[in-house]
């Protein structure tokens, strides 16, 4: 059984027991979160596709960790001008473990 749900402007395909990195959620470690925006739920041959969401479907998860991703370097280089600008960015994320899918 797997489901596709939406969180942080992105869609995630998950199954039970899987650990997923999402955009940062303001929750404490160990907290339980429910995602009601389930776009699709598949249970064997039974496929439910929402328009836009599946009614009554939700994905339940537990917050495992909060953290920051790998550094992305931004470089602006102006040729022949002896000018260069460098900047870095690390995006915050929330790591959750999927504990249940209900349809």
Swiss-Prot record:
Taken from the UniProt entry, a GO cellular component term is: cytoplasm
GO terms classed as biological process: translation
A Pfam family matched in the record: Ribosomal_L21p
Instruction: Look up keyword Isomerase and say if it applies.
Output: no
Q: Which domain of life is it from?
A: Bacteria
Spell out the coiled coil positions from the record: none
Keywords assigned by UniProt?
Ribonucleoprotein, Ribosomal protein, RNA-binding, rRNA-binding
Signal peptide as annotated in the record: none
Q: Which GO terms describe its molecular function?
A: rRNA binding; structural constituent of ribosome
Protein's UniProt keywords contain rRNA-binding = yes
Give the family this protein belongs to, as stated in its UniProt record.
Answer: Belongs to the bacterial ribosomal protein bL21 family.
Q: Which NCBIfam families match?
A: L21
Subunit structure as annotated in this protein's UniProt entry: Part of the 50S ribosomal subunit. Contacts protein L20.
Physiological role: This protein binds to 23S rRNA in the presence of protein L20.
Under what name is this protein listed? Large ribosomal subunit protein bL21
List the top taxonomic levels of the source.
Answer: Bacteria, Pseudomonadati, Pseudomonadota, Gammaproteobacteria, Pasteurellales
């Amino acid at each position: 059984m797997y489901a596709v749900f939406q969180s942080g402007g992105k869609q995630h395909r998950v199954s039970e027991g899987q650990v997923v990195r999402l955009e940062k959620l303001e929750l404490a470690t160990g907290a339980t979160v429910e995602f009601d925006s389930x776009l699709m739920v598949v249970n064997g041959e039974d496929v439910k596709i929402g328009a836009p969401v599946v009614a009554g479907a939700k994905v339940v998860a537990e917050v495992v960790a909060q953290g920051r991703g790998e550094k992305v370097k931004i470089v602006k280089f102006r040729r022949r001008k002896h000018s260069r600008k460098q900047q870095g960015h690390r995006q915050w994320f929330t790591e959750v473990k999927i504990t249940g899918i209900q349809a």
